[in-house]
């Protein structure tokens, strides 16, 4: 059964190698075109069936049934300067595509159910043509399947979503002494999310908890770490998240504010790389008419990685060269056009301005240390088609 599911997910991911998302750390800023158009905001504001991906309690806003499917084109721009005088090298991991499908239906006066598949996280670089950067290629991909079940009474909704997560990780490089790497490793594990929402007058408040999911990628981190003199396990957990959100609707306008914490310090693997917890703030605005809607948003979280100093130069190298999660600000705009009462089209664009970090890093054991610099910016274009029936 696991092999069958893995094959299905690999087929979906074949649309594009997901090597870098518009991200807080390695977690997507948002999932779905409506949420992305508001920079990920959606814990306290319903986006229809798409809410299954953000706060499953809010799928109770649909009238009958709704299906949304689409995808996001991610275009990261990453470079690394190893401090040896040759100048920066650009990562070739500059385009990826992730599909998204979300379905929700009202099955009784109080009970709603859905199903969805969506990419949730990813990060990586591709320096295979840069020997000075060890020809390093890293690629983390995560995708989830979920079945949200929600119950609504009066203005209160509660939901739980059992999750099945597929993950793949590939780390390979050549430090000049031969290839290091074990090919792509995959895993399939379970988790869950819990959502709550309450509507009172023009306000909606929401809360969501997403469980940590422990993933094990055979021989990936241990093999890569050993080459840098590090002793690492092969677990790389998807971190737990806790979020709160509120929205206020007045006329055609809605303003929404979300806060969530991403628990990197408790996540296996990320603890070894010294990642810090992130406090994420998202602010979104929507103007909606019967035929169209426009959205704006801003998302901010400080980088989870930091300079670990001269005692941890190998960790600095792995973070900056392989997993440069340094982007902090995200600006978004989006919209919806309603072709009819049954059919609509969503679009969103997210831009993350360039961030730059310089750490003391090690090229390889016994080769000394030097200052290395990574620059990273991101842009993403998301589209979706929605059907109500």
Residue ranges of each PLM-predicted region?
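Gram-negative bacterial Sec-dependent N-terminal signal peptides
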Residues: 1-22
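Alpha-helical transmembrane segments and their juxtamembrane interfaces
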Residues: 13-16, 65, 156, 292
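Residue-level signal for pocket-adjacent positions within structured domains
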Residues: 23, 33-40, 47-49, 54
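Outer-membrane beta-barrel porins/channels
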Residues: 23-36, 81-89, 95-389
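Transmembrane beta-strand segments of Gram-negative outer membrane beta-barrel proteins
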Residues: 27-42, 60-77
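Residue-level detector of alpha-helical secondary structure
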Residues: 37, 51-58, 68, 384
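Outer-membrane beta-barrel pore proteins
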Residues: 43-45, 52-65, 103-107
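Short hydrophobic "helix-edge" motifs at membrane interfaces and signal-peptide entry regions
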Residues: 44-47, 331
């Amino acid at each position: 059964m696991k092999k069958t599911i893995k094959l299905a997910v690999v087929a979906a991911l074949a649309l594009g190698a997901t090597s870098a998302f518009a991200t807080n750390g390695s977690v997507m800023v948002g999932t779905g075109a409506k949420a992305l158009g508001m920079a990920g905001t959606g814990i306290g504001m319903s986006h229809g069936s798409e809410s299954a991906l953000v706060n499953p309690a809010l799928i109770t806003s649909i009238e009958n049934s709704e299906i949304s499917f689409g995808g996001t084109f991610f275009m990261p721009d990453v470079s690394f300067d190893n401090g040896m005088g040759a100048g920066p090298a650009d990562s070739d991991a500059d385009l990826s595509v992730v599909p998204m499908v979300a379905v929700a239906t009202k099955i009784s006066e109080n009970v709603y159910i859905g199903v969805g598949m969506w990419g949730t996280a990813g990060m990586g670089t591709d320096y295979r043509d840069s020997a000075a950067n060890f020809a390093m290629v890293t690629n983390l991909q995560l995708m989830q399947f979920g079945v949200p079940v929600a119950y609504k009474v009066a203005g209160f909704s509660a939901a739980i979503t059992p999750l099945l997560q597929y993950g793949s990780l590939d780390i390979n490089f050549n430090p000049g002494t031969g290839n290091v790497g074990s090919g792509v490793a995959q895993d399939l594990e379970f988790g869950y999310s819990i959502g709550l929402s309450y509507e009172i007058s023009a306000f909606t408040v929401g809360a969501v908890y997403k469980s940590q999911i422990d993933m094990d990628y055979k021989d990936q981190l241990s093999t890569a770490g050993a080459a840098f003199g590090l002793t690492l396990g092969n677990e790389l957990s998807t971190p737990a998240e806790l979020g709160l959100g509120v929205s206020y609707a007045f006329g055609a306008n809605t303003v929404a504010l979300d806060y969530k914490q991403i628990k990197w310090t408790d996540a296996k693997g990320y603890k070894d790389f010294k990642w810090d917890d992130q406090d994420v703030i998202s602010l979104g605005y929507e103007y909606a008419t019967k035929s169209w809607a426009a959205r704006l948003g801003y998302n901010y979280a400080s980088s989870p990685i930091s300079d670990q100093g001269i005692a941890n130069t190998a960790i600095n190298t792995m973070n900056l060269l392989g997993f440069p999660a340094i982007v902090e600000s995200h600006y978004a705009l989006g919209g919806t056009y309603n072709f009819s009462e049954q059919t609509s089209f969503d679009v969103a664009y997210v831009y993350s301005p360039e961030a730059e970090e310089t750490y003391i890093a090690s090229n390889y054991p016994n080769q000394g240390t030097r200052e290395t610099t990574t620059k990273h910016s991101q842009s993403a274009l998301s589209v979706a088609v929605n059907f109500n029936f």
